[in-house]
């Protein structure tokens, strides 16, 4: 009999553990793989393997990050855990590992701590859509009233940061008890909290909308004039799909309103394509557009789906000297280049009131004013460059103008 083909039948969801140092993020990550491995739905990854996470580079920044994968009956998960607090900040801002949902780990005896708040705030600013809470180390608490107080405090913290605090599932348990248990019985009581948590993640974290189902958008990388045929723009489709006859807008890099045009052809590797979809590198032929009227850095998009803006708020991580960043602080009025999708645009930085300067290694919210509007939206990631090197990474948290 022929071998069965592996079918990816389950939806794929990206999750990650967040929370204060030593509250049990890595222990929980290891415990999830251990318990699901008993069901044959994961490979066990030990605490030490996660703790000694390999380094990756994203947008010019080095981040220590560990990826594990596992399955439930309903979904396939990729799960990220970062050993250091700074690595979390860098991962969330660069989007090195995108999260469709987060598991916030809080130690019951300690309650919410400064990094708990910081991670929740960041999760809000980088548009993590949903969160589930694992209240850890409950075996160290025998006072039910105190546990309820910690839960109340957590729900309030989540509500204050724009998450639906009253709805967020809070699962109580001990990650260490699950991880150190010798039992191979999936129904052992110490494993119940892990199964309950995965159930909550399955139920509460929504399946992400696939990029292909979103409105069309393609950042323009190059422009060619083809004699007798018109102008072709090339790039990688970021989301949605495009076909001949579609109306699209050319957006950004100008103070004029976006221009509308019609797609007269889509090509890939010199061959005609019926439809280009998210992830494809394509050439798009545009009707009635001169070679000089379109440039790299603009985007091609479904009409009305994205607008050009020049002023926005952003959450930014400023690289340390050791990471190849600046050696000195910068002040309000600093004018670096912002590398947004396919282009560098000069912009001025305005620091929040009461903040005199920004040091290398800081994580800060700032307002940015570009010299020309570009297509941006909340959640969009960018790099800050100066003299050809990356000095920071950011994510748009709000549009101002």
From Swiss-Prot:
Keywords: Cytoplasm, Elongation factor, GTP-binding, Hydrolase, Magnesium, Metal-binding, Nucleotide-binding, Protein biosynthesis
Pfam families in the record: GTP_EFTU, GTP_EFTU_D2, GTP_EFTU_D3
Catalysed reactions listed for this entry: GTP + H2O = GDP + phosphate + H(+)
Region (G5): 174-176
Residue numbers spanned by region G2: 60-64
GO molecular function, one term: GTPase activity
Compartments reported by the entry: Cytoplasm
EC number(s) on file: 3.6.5.3
Domain tr-type G: 10-209
Cellular compartments per GO CC: cytosol
Binding site for GTP: 19-26, 81-85, 136-139
Record-listed Mg(2+) binding positions: 26
Keyword Glycosyltransferase: no
Key word Protease present: no
Top-level lineage group: Bacteria
Function: GTP hydrolase that promotes the GTP-dependent binding of aminoacyl-tRNA to the A-site of ribosomes during protein biosynthesis.
The family this protein is said to belong to: Belongs to the TRAFAC class translation factor GTPase superfamily. Classic translation factor GTPase family. EF-Tu/EF-1A subfamily.
Oligomer status and interactors: Monomer.
Name assigned to this protein: Elongation factor Tu 2
Organism: Roseiflexus sp. (strain RS-1)
